[in-house]
Amino acid sequence: MPILRTELLPGYPIFQVQHPAVTARIALHGAHLMEWTPVGQAAALYLSPQAVYEPGKAIRGGVPVCWPWFGPNTGDPSLPMHGFVRNRFWKPGDFSETETGVRLQFLLTDDAETRRLWPHAFQLELVMELGASLHMALKMTNSGEVPFTITGALHTYLWIGDIHQATVTGLDGISYLDTVGTPSQQVQAGDIDFDREVDRIYTTSHSITIVDAGLARNITISGSGSGSAVVWNPWIEKSKILADLPDGDYHRFICVETTNARWDSITLAAGESHVLATEIKITVPS
């Protein structure tokens, strides 16, 4: 099995994947995919060189799992940004290998600490299939006796050559909420080019593509179980106030996230489940 458990730091376990088709690293803290690099490709995910690896601290970059809320908690902004599951150690489940890649399963259930933050019983299963493409599926189950409503995201930081040579396609004509400054409802006209901070929630279940001229490749993100998608880049000023992000690294990534955000919230009755999933493929234009 090409999966090795080791420690990034004492008490901070990670899994390293060395497979003929792919290399990857996953932190047990947050079940956080830190690296996914298909053979023959540059790294597909951006990971901040200033990321903090401490229990209770979210990792900047890779694919954070945001749940059971996305963004600030609307009822209590003092609660952790983007929920709490990215800040907790998950349990490893079943791992397997095929000729084309590996499959890893991670599990998390409620406990006294999570119920202090959010008073509901739940079970989460995150499955990663890593190879030439990436597939991640977050299955959420209400294991309690009362309904609950969640928002969430698979917050993918995608590595690019240069923000000035990258565009995002597939959203022309789609309505979105622009959350930079005073929130406003807009409609996308053409592709997205980057010359300022972008933080938008799109009403879409379409595939979205990053056209990256800098690395001469396209990255296509396809979501399921989702009716919304977020496109984010912090740009210059916000990067300066994010302590775990180098000031100039805004030009190295674009976040295109499969989400259940804002109006796309999910309500689960007792015993019900929902799966939020994303698939990412890299192609080289001819």
What are these regions (language model features)?
Residues 147-149, 153-230:
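Active-site/ligand-binding surface loops and adjacent short beta/alpha elements
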Residues 26, 138-144, 282:
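Asparagine-centered strand-capping/turn motif at beta-strand->loop junctions
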Residues 45-87, 210, 222-245:
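Hot-dog-fold acyl-thioester-processing enzymes
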Residues 4-5, 79-131:
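Extended, loop-rich substrate-binding clefts of extracytoplasmic carbohydrate-active enzymes
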Residues 124, 134-136, 274:
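Hydrophobic core residues within well-ordered beta-strands of beta-rich domains
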Residues 1-60, 206-227, 270-286:
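Beta-strand-rich N-terminal accessory domains
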Residues 54-55, 93, 125-127, 263-268:
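Beta-strand-rich interaction surfaces with strong enrichment in secreted/lumenal proteins
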